[in-house]
Amino acid sequence: MIIPSNSEKFNQDWLELISHDPVHPTIAKESRTAGTRTVLMYDEGEQHQCMICTKVSDDLVRSMKDIFVDSKEEGLTAMFYTIFRLPDALRGVGARALREAVNHFSAQGVKNFYTLSPVPSLRKHFDAPPSEEQVREFIASRQDPVAKFHLGNGATLHAVNFDADSSDIRQGESWGIMVNYRYTV
């Protein structure tokens, strides 16, 4: 079951679980729930399994900086910028949580579903920043764990974004390169 942070059923204490986010650990919990951003808690049975951080936007978002620019109104595009399993969560729960999140936003009239995803193993495979074509080939090879997850769950690579994240983590992993995967309903 998906429980959005703007729901009465969402316990605000759950936001403390954001500290387990391995993708964007430095983003404050308050920033994740402001404007058109929300945190989704995915539960199975009585246990919290997964958290998904999203932004609903009027268009595709191609950088982390733009994730935090508030849209004037909610749009037709859901951007998933963090998805992570919680400690002791079941294996494979991320795929189920993502499907539930798509269903949740579809019911609200959202039509487009994208991620803004890191490529954490990019620097391990290239000595210098790769070209867009090289990134696309690398993603298609599924050697990157994030690519393997999204492509394995039916997404397609939509865009390669250079200078998409200036954080030390992204610079160290991928020269700040991030990608958009697209999920179709």
Which residues make up each language-model segment?
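Extended, composition-driven regions rather than compact fold-specific motifs
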Residues: M1-R91, A95-V185
